[in-house]
Amino acid sequence: MSLDLSTSLSPARPLESADAMEERLREIGAARYHDRHPFHHMLHGGELTKGQVQAWALNRYYYQCTIPVKDAVVISRFRDRATRIEWRHRLEDHDGAEGAEGGIDRWLILTDGLGLDRAYVESTEGILPATRFAVEAYVHFVRDRSPLEAIASCLTELFAPNIHATRISGMLSHYDFINPTVMAYFQRRLTQAPRDADYALRYVRDHARTPEERAAVCNALIFKTQVLWTQLDALHHAYVLGHVPPGAFVPEEMR
């Protein structure tokens, strides 16, 4: 399968305004967001086996269940009460609230529907080493870099609605083991992600006031795209090329 990855960023130029920074951010998304990865093209095009889809959902669960941990770290970086209040809803979006399911619950509906044992999924013992390292690197990034960069790293949400829509239509049309119930996570993110992205974009536009700060925002987004891309590289290497590392989940057709 051929894939055009020729999209490149504009030549380096000083980011003298918020508009210039936003333009650069959108270029980064167009060139580097993981909707361009071959594994996602296979997933959405119906080219994967059920076992390969199981491996994707199992590994992605580690990312999903770590997102509220990441968001709690982001909240801890701010003395500003208004920012903490704004960011707090992200915890409930993923963890849920009393009497209301969250994104992690919806992801487990997906893995249940794919026939994976819930206790095994939640243990994360079968995930790929690269999945664990990439996700943990994301948590470390928001902990160790500036609060501005922590928020900027979430800007992949600018590009998420398109991939969610493609995933919903593609997987429903191509896989007989997928139904609307198990795709509930992605359906909900169609409205949650734009809200989150709008806030994060406004924040970096308002608070990145120098060319250096705007460059740091752009580099934070690049880092996040690398976190996402690395996870798909690992899935492709293990479950398409067949190099499953010791201790990782092995689909039935590969046993």
Swiss-Prot record:
The keyword Oxidoreductase applies. It comes from Cereibacter sphaeroides (strain ATCC 17023 / DSM 158 / JCM 6121 / CCUG 31486 / LMG 2827 / NBRC 12203 / NCIMB 8253 / ATH 2.4.1.) (Rhodobacter sphaeroides). Belongs to the PqqC family. This is Pyrroloquinoline-quinone synthase. The keyword Oxidoreductase applies. Pfam families: TENA_THI-4. Pathway: Cofactor biosynthesis; pyrroloquinoline quinone biosynthesis. It comes from the Bacteria. Its EC number is 1.3.3.11. GO terms for molecular function: pyrroloquinoline-quinone synthase activity. Ring cyclization and eight-electron oxidation of 3a-(2-amino-2-carboxyethyl)-4,5-dioxo-4,5,6,7,8,9-hexahydroquinoline-7,9-dicarboxylic-acid to PQQ. Signal peptide: none annotated. Keywords: Oxidoreductase, PQQ biosynthesis. GO terms for biological process: pyrroloquinoline quinone biosynthetic process; sulfur compound metabolic process. The gene is pqqC.
